Amino acid sequence: AFSGKARLNIYKVSFKIWKDHLILGSGYGSFLSIFRNYYAKERSIGSNVTSFGSKNVLHPHNEFLFWLVEGGILPVIGFLIMIIGFIKMTLKGGRQALASIGCFFPILFHTQLEYPFYNSTIHLILFVFFIYLIDKEYGVQYHFKNNLKIIPKLLAIIIPLCSVIFLLTVLQTGYMINKYEKTGFKKLEYLERALNPYSMKKKYDNLALKSHLIIAKKAKDQNMLKSYISIVEKNLKHSPFMFLYYDLATAYQALGNMEKAWEIYKKGKYLYPDANWKD
């Protein structure tokens, strides 16, 4: 969690990113990487920006600012047009409609200080559900004849069943990952038993890479080390995690390329100037 001062600094850096990518944004999925680079630049020039240590900033803690940074002004304009249209439709219902709009305010307020849509399915479901209720009550309704009456019944069974199966595989995957971590990254078979690694893809992939590096160093396998380096260098473009820089430098060191190892290490220290690095 970040303090009020830290959030203001996140807004400040995020706004600078948006000013440099005004129309089209920096690209979807780029916030983690581009924020880290802008933050490091601010720290390097002595700007009075709050220290984040080794913490990663995944979101600016403001939904509209998040869209501005990654998508630019265009998606925000589109969203505002939808909001205005929705409010106009709802106002036709009088005072009762205004009470319905009030259901949105707690969630909308939350989106300006946190990132509920980014990491909370419940917030998103509630938000969509409120839209559905208001649209059903005050919106224009269209009806069509469904000749295949069995389809809704089948979907009512299939969707919950698939959801339960998926959630069970997520729990099993989390359990296996936890067991693997408790072994000190030694028993790879726990990781291999995970049924749904895609549900925790980033965490799973990073753990798999960690085990890849451990095995490669132990076996002194240069091909495995080069393979690891190739994968991590690609990942760093969108996920510049501190531990990846440290491990990548270690991989180059294992290959005997100390010059490159120090280059990677210094790059990591530049991006994470407040972290506790071990020289």
Kindly label every feature range from the protein language model.
Residues 244, 270-279:
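Boundary/linker segments of alpha-helical solenoid repeat arrays
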Residues 71-99, 264:
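Hydrophobic transmembrane alpha-helices and their immediate junctions
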Residues 259-274:
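TPR/TPR-like (Sel1-like) alpha-helical repeat modules
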Residues 167-240, 248:
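Membrane-interface segments at or immediately adjacent to transmembrane helices
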Residues 146-174:
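Internal/C-terminal transmembrane anchor helices
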Residues 96-150:
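Transmembrane alpha-helices of multi-pass inner-membrane enzymes
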Residues 1-6, 10-12, 16-19, 26-70:
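Interfacial juxtamembrane loops and adjacent helix segments
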